[in-house]
Amino acid sequence: TVVGDWLADASAADVFEHPGARDVVRREQFQAQGAASTREVLERIPGVSAPLNNGTGSHDLALNFGIRGLNPRLASRSTVLMDGIPVPFAPYGQPQLSLAPVSIGNMDAVDVVRGGGAVRYGPQNVGGIVNFVTRAIPEDFATKLDVHSELSPSSSQDGLKTTHNVLIGGTGANGLGGALLYSGTRGGDWREHSDTRIDDLILKGRFQPSDEHAFSAMTQYYDGEADMPGGLGTAAYRDDPYQSTRPYDKFWGRRTLASASYEYTPNASQKLNVTGFFTKTLRSGYLDQGRNLTLSPREYWVRGLETRFSQGFELGESRHEVGIGHRYVNEASHELRYWTRADSGQL
Protein backbone atom coordinates (compact mmCIF):
# COMPACT_ATOMS: atom_id res chain seq x y z
CA THR A 1 0.00 0.00 0.00
CA VAL A 2 1.35 3.44 -0.92
CA VAL A 3 1.98 5.90 1.89
CA GLY A 4 1.41 9.17 0.02
CA ASP A 5 1.49 11.65 2.90
CA TRP A 6 4.39 10.57 5.11
CA LEU A 7 3.04 12.49 8.10
CA ALA A 8 -0.63 11.41 7.81
CA ASP A 9 -2.21 11.08 11.27
CA ALA A 10 1.00 9.82 12.95
CA SER A 11 -0.43 6.35 13.56
CA ALA A 12 1.76 3.68 15.13
CA ALA A 13 2.10 1.93 11.75
CA ASP A 14 3.17 5.17 10.02
CA VAL A 15 5.85 5.81 12.62
CA PHE A 16 7.10 2.21 12.60
CA GLU A 17 7.50 2.15 8.81
CA HIS A 18 9.07 5.62 8.56
CA PRO A 19 12.67 5.29 7.26
CA GLY A 20 14.34 7.75 9.60
CA ALA A 21 14.38 9.41 13.01
CA ARG A 22 10.84 10.08 14.18
CA ASP A 23 9.15 10.42 17.57
CA VAL A 24 5.48 10.85 18.42
CA VAL A 25 4.07 11.85 21.79
CA ARG A 26 0.38 10.99 22.03
CA ARG A 27 -2.36 12.60 24.08
CA GLU A 28 -2.49 9.80 26.65
CA GLN A 29 1.21 10.29 27.30
CA PHE A 30 1.31 14.05 27.76
CA GLN A 31 -1.86 13.97 29.84
CA ALA A 32 -0.33 11.32 32.12
CA GLN A 33 2.80 13.46 32.43
CA GLY A 34 0.75 16.51 33.38
CA ALA A 35 2.09 18.62 30.50
CA ALA A 36 0.32 21.98 30.45
CA SER A 37 1.90 23.46 27.33
CA THR A 38 3.31 22.60 23.93
CA ARG A 39 6.78 23.45 25.20
CA GLU A 40 6.59 20.84 27.97
CA VAL A 41 5.68 18.13 25.44
CA LEU A 42 8.48 19.05 23.02
CA GLU A 43 11.06 19.19 25.82
CA ARG A 44 10.55 15.45 26.45
CA ILE A 45 11.37 14.43 22.86
CA PRO A 46 14.96 13.27 22.16
CA GLY A 47 16.99 15.80 20.19
CA VAL A 48 14.60 18.70 20.90
CA SER A 49 15.46 21.66 23.13
CA ALA A 50 12.48 23.82 24.14
CA PRO A 51 13.58 26.56 26.57
CA LEU A 52 11.19 28.58 28.69
CA ASN A 53 9.61 31.76 27.34
CA ASN A 54 11.55 34.18 29.51
CA GLY A 55 13.35 37.46 29.08
CA THR A 56 12.18 40.67 27.44
CA GLY A 57 9.46 40.17 24.83
CA SER A 58 8.57 36.62 25.94
CA HIS A 59 5.06 35.33 26.58
CA ASP A 60 2.90 32.19 26.48
CA LEU A 61 1.69 32.82 22.93
CA ALA A 62 5.21 32.31 21.54
CA LEU A 63 7.06 29.03 21.02
CA ASN A 64 10.81 28.42 21.20
CA PHE A 65 12.45 25.12 20.29
CA GLY A 66 15.43 23.83 18.34
CA ILE A 67 16.22 20.37 16.97
CA ARG A 68 19.68 18.82 17.12
CA GLY A 69 21.47 21.88 18.46
CA LEU A 70 19.94 24.56 16.23
CA ASN A 71 19.06 27.97 17.65
CA PRO A 72 15.73 27.54 19.48
CA ARG A 73 14.66 31.19 19.28
CA LEU A 74 11.07 31.26 17.97
CA ALA A 75 11.59 27.87 16.23
CA SER A 76 12.61 29.56 12.98
CA ARG A 77 14.80 26.69 11.75
CA SER A 78 12.07 24.01 11.69
CA THR A 79 8.96 23.45 9.62
CA VAL A 80 6.00 23.64 12.01
CA LEU A 81 2.64 22.28 10.82
CA MET A 82 -0.81 21.59 12.19
CA ASP A 83 -2.50 18.74 10.33
CA GLY A 84 -0.05 19.45 7.52
CA ILE A 85 -0.91 23.19 7.34
CA PRO A 86 1.91 25.70 8.08
CA VAL A 87 1.64 27.24 11.54
CA PRO A 88 3.87 30.36 11.10
CA PHE A 89 2.04 33.51 10.00
CA ALA A 90 4.44 33.75 7.01
CA PRO A 91 6.09 30.30 6.55
CA TYR A 92 8.55 31.49 3.90
CA GLY A 93 9.06 35.18 4.65
CA GLN A 94 8.90 35.23 8.47
CA PRO A 95 8.86 31.67 9.89
CA GLN A 96 9.35 32.79 13.50
CA LEU A 97 6.71 31.70 16.01
CA SER A 98 6.31 34.89 18.02
CA LEU A 99 2.65 33.90 17.69
CA ALA A 100 2.16 30.11 17.81
CA PRO A 101 -1.59 29.47 17.43
CA VAL A 102 -1.39 25.89 18.73
CA SER A 103 -3.04 24.74 21.97
CA ILE A 104 -1.92 21.40 23.35
CA GLY A 105 -5.46 20.82 24.66
CA ASN A 106 -6.73 20.53 21.06
CA MET A 107 -4.05 18.03 20.01
CA ASP A 108 -4.03 14.23 19.77
CA ALA A 109 -0.30 13.95 19.07
CA VAL A 110 2.95 15.86 18.54
CA ASP A 111 4.93 14.31 15.67
CA VAL A 112 8.63 15.19 15.27
CA VAL A 113 10.50 14.08 12.13
CA ARG A 114 14.26 14.57 11.97
CA GLY A 115 16.76 13.82 9.24
CA GLY A 116 16.19 13.37 5.50
CA GLY A 117 12.42 12.97 5.70
CA ALA A 118 12.12 16.69 6.38
CA VAL A 119 13.25 17.53 2.83
CA ARG A 120 9.88 16.46 1.45
CA TYR A 121 8.04 19.21 3.28
CA GLY A 122 10.08 22.34 3.98
CA PRO A 123 10.65 25.22 3.70
CA GLN A 124 12.71 25.31 6.94
CA ASN A 125 13.68 21.66 6.68
CA VAL A 126 17.22 21.87 8.11
CA GLY A 127 15.65 21.74 11.58
CA GLY A 128 13.21 18.92 10.92
CA ILE A 129 9.42 18.88 10.99
CA VAL A 130 7.03 19.24 13.90
CA ASN A 131 3.45 18.35 13.00
CA PHE A 132 0.72 18.95 15.55
CA VAL A 133 -2.13 16.47 14.99
CA THR A 134 -5.52 17.80 16.10
CA ARG A 135 -7.97 15.61 17.99
CA ALA A 136 -9.68 13.09 15.74
CA ILE A 137 -13.39 13.15 14.98
CA PRO A 138 -14.94 10.38 17.16
CA GLU A 139 -16.55 7.41 15.42
CA ASP A 140 -19.52 7.65 17.82
CA PHE A 141 -20.99 10.84 19.21
CA ALA A 142 -19.02 11.95 22.25
CA THR A 143 -18.52 14.90 24.57
CA LYS A 144 -15.24 15.23 26.45
CA LEU A 145 -14.15 17.87 28.96
CA ASP A 146 -10.98 18.23 30.98
CA VAL A 147 -9.59 20.99 33.17
CA HIS A 148 -5.97 21.70 34.11
CA SER A 149 -4.96 24.23 36.77
CA GLU A 150 -1.60 25.52 38.01
CA LEU A 151 -0.82 27.29 41.26
CA SER A 152 2.42 28.83 42.52
CA PRO A 153 1.62 29.49 46.20
CA SER A 154 4.99 31.02 47.13
CA SER A 155 5.00 33.53 44.26
CA SER A 156 3.16 36.71 43.35
CA GLN A 157 0.60 34.80 41.29
CA ASP A 158 -2.94 35.98 41.94
CA GLY A 159 -5.13 32.87 41.75
CA LEU A 160 -5.01 29.85 39.46
CA LYS A 161 -3.92 29.54 35.86
CA THR A 162 -6.58 27.29 34.36
CA THR A 163 -7.05 25.64 30.97
CA HIS A 164 -10.36 24.13 29.81
CA ASN A 165 -10.46 21.67 26.89
CA VAL A 166 -13.65 20.53 25.17
CA LEU A 167 -14.44 18.10 22.34
CA ILE A 168 -17.95 17.56 20.95
CA GLY A 169 -18.60 15.49 17.82
CA GLY A 170 -19.13 12.18 16.10
CA THR A 171 -19.54 10.35 12.78
CA GLY A 172 -22.79 9.20 11.18
CA ALA A 173 -23.52 5.95 9.36
CA ASN A 174 -23.21 7.75 6.00
CA GLY A 175 -19.55 8.61 6.64
CA LEU A 176 -20.20 12.27 7.49
CA GLY A 177 -18.59 13.44 10.71
CA GLY A 178 -17.67 16.59 12.54
CA ALA A 179 -16.13 17.83 15.75
CA LEU A 180 -15.89 21.08 17.68
CA LEU A 181 -12.69 21.60 19.66
CA TYR A 182 -12.04 24.34 22.19
CA SER A 183 -9.10 25.12 24.44
CA GLY A 184 -9.10 28.21 26.65
CA THR A 185 -6.56 29.50 29.17
CA ARG A 186 -6.98 32.13 31.87
CA GLY A 187 -4.57 33.27 34.58
CA GLY A 188 -0.98 34.22 35.30
CA ASP A 189 2.32 32.51 36.02
CA TRP A 190 4.57 32.91 39.07
CA ARG A 191 5.70 36.41 37.99
CA GLU A 192 3.81 39.65 38.38
CA HIS A 193 2.37 41.13 35.18
CA SER A 194 1.99 37.70 33.52
CA ASP A 195 -1.77 37.39 32.99
CA THR A 196 -2.66 35.36 29.90
CA ARG A 197 -5.89 34.81 27.98
CA ILE A 198 -6.12 32.32 25.11
CA ASP A 199 -9.18 31.13 23.17
CA ASP A 200 -8.61 28.48 20.50
CA LEU A 201 -11.66 27.20 18.60
CA ILE A 202 -11.44 24.55 15.86
CA LEU A 203 -14.24 23.08 13.74
CA LYS A 204 -13.43 19.91 11.78
CA GLY A 205 -15.46 17.99 9.22
CA ARG A 206 -14.91 14.81 7.22
CA PHE A 207 -16.99 12.97 4.61
CA GLN A 208 -15.99 9.57 3.26
CA PRO A 209 -18.70 8.30 0.91
CA SER A 210 -16.59 5.33 -0.21
CA ASP A 211 -13.19 3.70 0.28
CA GLU A 212 -11.83 5.63 -2.73
CA HIS A 213 -12.90 9.17 -1.85
CA ALA A 214 -12.47 11.24 1.31
CA PHE A 215 -13.14 14.95 1.86
CA SER A 216 -12.11 16.92 4.94
CA ALA A 217 -12.18 20.54 6.06
CA MET A 218 -11.05 22.54 9.07
CA THR A 219 -11.51 26.08 10.34
CA GLN A 220 -9.77 27.69 13.30
CA TYR A 221 -10.11 30.93 15.21
CA TYR A 222 -7.32 31.64 17.69
CA ASP A 223 -7.26 34.76 19.84
CA GLY A 224 -4.92 35.53 22.70
CA GLU A 225 -3.23 38.24 24.72
CA ALA A 226 -0.50 38.11 27.34
CA ASP A 227 1.23 40.49 29.69
CA MET A 228 5.03 40.22 29.46
CA PRO A 229 6.89 40.44 32.79
CA GLY A 230 10.29 40.78 31.10
CA GLY A 231 13.74 40.04 32.49
CA LEU A 232 15.34 41.17 35.74
CA GLY A 233 18.81 42.37 36.52
CA THR A 234 20.83 40.84 39.37
CA ALA A 235 19.91 43.50 41.91
CA ALA A 236 16.20 43.46 41.02
CA TYR A 237 16.11 39.66 41.22
CA ARG A 238 17.71 39.65 44.66
CA ASP A 239 15.21 42.24 45.82
CA ASP A 240 12.14 40.36 44.53
CA PRO A 241 12.39 37.50 42.00
CA TYR A 242 8.63 37.64 41.33
CA GLN A 243 8.39 41.30 40.40
CA SER A 244 8.08 42.84 36.95
CA THR A 245 9.74 46.14 36.08
CA ARG A 246 8.06 46.44 32.67
CA PRO A 247 4.41 47.41 33.34
CA TYR A 248 3.64 48.41 29.73
CA ASP A 249 4.87 45.32 27.84
CA LYS A 250 2.00 43.34 26.33
CA PHE A 251 1.43 41.08 23.31
CA TRP A 252 -1.74 40.03 21.51
CA GLY A 253 -2.61 38.20 18.33
CA ARG A 254 -5.31 36.33 16.48
CA ARG A 255 -5.47 33.98 13.54
CA THR A 256 -8.21 32.69 11.25
CA LEU A 257 -7.55 29.51 9.28
CA ALA A 258 -9.60 27.66 6.67
CA SER A 259 -8.46 24.51 4.88
CA ALA A 260 -9.97 21.79 2.71
CA SER A 261 -8.50 18.58 1.34
CA TYR A 262 -9.43 15.71 -0.93
CA GLU A 263 -7.92 12.21 -0.95
CA TYR A 264 -8.43 9.77 -3.81
CA THR A 265 -7.25 6.15 -3.43
CA PRO A 266 -8.37 4.14 -6.48
CA ASN A 267 -6.30 1.11 -5.45
CA ALA A 268 -3.51 0.03 -3.12
CA SER A 269 -0.81 1.34 -5.50
CA GLN A 270 -2.05 4.88 -6.15
CA LYS A 271 -3.01 7.85 -4.04
CA LEU A 272 -3.79 11.51 -4.80
CA ASN A 273 -3.91 14.27 -2.17
CA VAL A 274 -5.04 17.85 -2.79
CA THR A 275 -4.98 20.47 -0.01
CA GLY A 276 -5.81 24.16 -0.06
CA PHE A 277 -5.58 26.61 2.83
CA PHE A 278 -5.90 30.27 3.79
CA THR A 279 -4.74 32.05 6.94
CA LYS A 280 -5.13 35.61 8.16
CA THR A 281 -3.04 36.63 11.17
CA LEU A 282 -2.64 39.72 13.32
CA ARG A 283 0.19 40.08 15.84
CA SER A 284 0.83 43.23 17.80
CA GLY A 285 2.00 44.53 21.14
CA TYR A 286 3.46 47.26 23.31
CA LEU A 287 7.17 47.13 24.11
CA ASP A 288 9.17 49.42 26.39
CA GLN A 289 12.42 50.24 24.58
CA GLY A 290 13.91 52.66 27.06
CA ARG A 291 13.13 56.21 25.95
CA ASN A 292 10.24 55.10 23.73
CA LEU A 293 7.20 52.84 23.92
CA THR A 294 6.43 51.13 20.62
CA LEU A 295 3.32 49.55 19.12
CA SER A 296 3.92 47.25 16.13
CA PRO A 297 0.72 45.87 14.54
CA ARG A 298 1.40 43.43 11.70
CA GLU A 299 -1.12 41.61 9.50
CA TYR A 300 -0.38 38.62 7.28
CA TRP A 301 -2.35 36.79 4.61
CA VAL A 302 -1.23 33.38 3.31
CA ARG A 303 -2.84 31.31 0.56
CA GLY A 304 -1.61 27.88 -0.43
CA LEU A 305 -2.40 24.91 -2.66
CA GLU A 306 -0.56 21.60 -2.57
CA THR A 307 -1.02 18.41 -4.58
CA ARG A 308 0.69 15.03 -4.27
CA PHE A 309 0.40 11.90 -6.36
CA SER A 310 2.05 8.66 -5.27
CA GLN A 311 2.54 5.53 -7.36
CA GLY A 312 3.77 2.22 -5.97
CA PHE A 313 5.46 -0.45 -8.05
CA GLU A 314 7.52 -3.61 -7.67
CA LEU A 315 11.06 -4.05 -8.94
CA GLY A 316 12.20 -7.60 -8.51
CA GLU A 317 11.51 -8.61 -4.92
CA SER A 318 11.43 -5.03 -3.62
CA ARG A 319 8.58 -2.54 -3.60
CA HIS A 320 9.06 1.15 -4.32
CA GLU A 321 7.03 4.33 -4.23
CA VAL A 322 7.44 7.41 -6.42
CA GLY A 323 5.78 10.70 -5.57
CA ILE A 324 5.27 13.88 -7.55
CA GLY A 325 3.53 17.09 -6.58
CA HIS A 326 3.60 20.85 -6.38
CA ARG A 327 3.13 23.59 -3.82
CA TYR A 328 1.96 27.14 -4.41
CA VAL A 329 2.12 29.66 -1.56
CA ASN A 330 1.30 33.37 -1.70
CA GLU A 331 2.19 35.61 1.25
CA ALA A 332 1.29 39.25 1.86
CA SER A 333 1.85 41.45 4.89
CA HIS A 334 1.07 44.92 6.20
CA GLU A 335 3.36 46.16 8.95
CA LEU A 336 3.17 49.40 10.94
CA ARG A 337 5.10 50.85 13.86
CA TYR A 338 4.04 53.60 16.25
CA TRP A 339 6.01 55.11 19.10
CA THR A 340 5.58 57.56 21.94
CA ARG A 341 7.87 58.89 24.63
CA ALA A 342 8.03 56.55 27.63
CA ASP A 343 7.80 59.47 30.05
CA SER A 344 4.52 60.64 28.49
CA GLY A 345 2.54 58.02 30.43
CA GLN A 346 0.28 57.44 27.42
CA LEU A 347 -0.16 54.40 25.19
Regions found by a protein language model. Name each.
Residues Q208-Y222, F251-L347:
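Face-selective signature of the C-terminal outer-membrane beta-barrel domain
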Residues G117, T134-G169, D189-W190:
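Short strand-turn segments of transmembrane beta-barrel domains in outer membranes
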Residues F30, L42, V110-D111, V130-F132:
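Non-catalytic regulatory/gating segments with a bias toward low-complexity or hydrophobic composition
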Residues I85-R114:
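Short acidic/polar hinge/loop motifs at secondary-structure boundaries
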Residues R39, E43-P86:
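Extracytoplasmic beta-strand/coil segments of soluble accessory domains associated
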Residues S156-R186, W190-M228, K250-N267, G316:
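Transmembrane beta-barrel wall of Gram-negative outer-membrane proteins
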Residues V3-Q33, H59-N64:
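N-terminal periplasmic "start-of-domain" segments of outer-membrane beta-barrel proteins
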Residues E150-S154, R186-R191, R197-I202, P241-Y248, ...:
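Extracellular loop and loop/strand-boundary signature of outer-membrane beta-barrel proteins
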